[in-house]
Amino acid sequence: MQETIIKRHEVMQTTRNYLVKHRFHEVEIPFLNKSTPEGARDFLVPSRINKGEFYALPQSPQTFKQILMVSGFDRYFNIIKCFRDEDLRNDRQPEFTQIDMEFSFVNQNMVIECIEGLLKEIVKTVKGIEVQTPFPRIGYDEAMERFGKDAPDTRIPFELKTISDIFTNSEFNVFKSTIANGGIIKALPVKDDGKLSRKMVDDYTVWVKTFRAG
């Protein structure tokens, strides 16, 4: 645990040094705020002075973005706690830390290059590994076509393949209606000569459902 805490400190210090070098200012924003529409429920803090009224802890740090931007802070960041009252999952918890970077008068490539540089600096400082940039990039359409999701894990060597032609004359209603309605049928090729037993397929079906798939 000590090693993890030290690495976390190194990541934060590297982040601050990098962003300050790139003309960002670190801005501290209030925790006690009004409730705003977000993706989860707010954690509420009762007000002692205003009976029956509550503050809301921030779900994301962008609440003050417009005020800061029009006040002249065209580049700022904060490393801040966020709070979301939602069901626990493997990748969800009620309190987490977020690195928030906001900057004006930039285009998409400028944003990507800035973040690539930050990640490269963090990995070099914390792990001693030199990462090559720019990172490989694929567009949304290509990602959906090849992987079926917009944020694929490219370490997984499987890609979706279109097999609609195989089922052109199929009487299986699921495939038949899909093709008739202009849809396509895709499959995920499995190596090892397709040696999957029925039990293995059933086990995989149960497993993917834990990720709310299928």
Model-identified regions with their sequence ranges:
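Class II aminoacyl-tRNA synthetase catalytic cores and aaRS-like
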Residues: 1-214
